[in-house]
Amino acid sequence: IRERSVSRGLGDVYKRQEDAFVGKLDSLFTADSSLEGETTSSDISGLIGQYAHGNEPSHHVIHMYNYVNRPWRTQELVDSVYRSQYANAVDGLSGNEDCGQMSAWYVLNSMGFYQVCPGKPVYSIGRPAFDKAVVNLPDGKKFTVIAKNNSKKNKYIKSMTLNGKPLDKPFFTHDDIIAGSTLEIEMTDRRTQP
């Protein structure tokens, strides 16, 4: 997982080697995850390939596809994690809920975004689970995310606007939240390229 860390700008480094980086990311999600042997316990780490969703330090990895112009892949994987790693049940989380990170991942991603690098005021847009989410801010401001044509089938983003202006990259800043912006996301059932 350290190989895929972004804390010091790894995304920028890998932009120069985009195909190699995408290959590394893809291999993480497609590698064999079978558990074998007499002393093997059941998987509680939420494996998708070798991506362990129950291991909180890897939560940012899905959003790395946005940094290498594969936002549709981020959208697919966020959708897959919603459906395979979370349930309204006693055992509804993979891994464990230490420090609230499992829930934090779900809350932010279900609103349609995630902060890939803590402390960096940039958010990566993924796949919203809700048609509308509102964050109430001081002074009566609101940060609103509206997902149009959102459904289980429509997991891909067709277009995005922030305060009515088209977004050509799947990112926005913390200042956009604090300003009380509106992020509108048009969903579709087909992959789209930036």
Could you tell me what each predicted segment is?
Residues 1-10, 14:
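Single conserved hydrophobic/aromatic residue that forms the stacking wall/gate
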Residues 12-45:
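Structured mid-domain segments that build the active-site/substrate or prosthetic-cofactor binding neighborhood
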Residues 28-36, 51-194:
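Non-catalytic C-terminal accessory modules of carbohydrate-active enzymes
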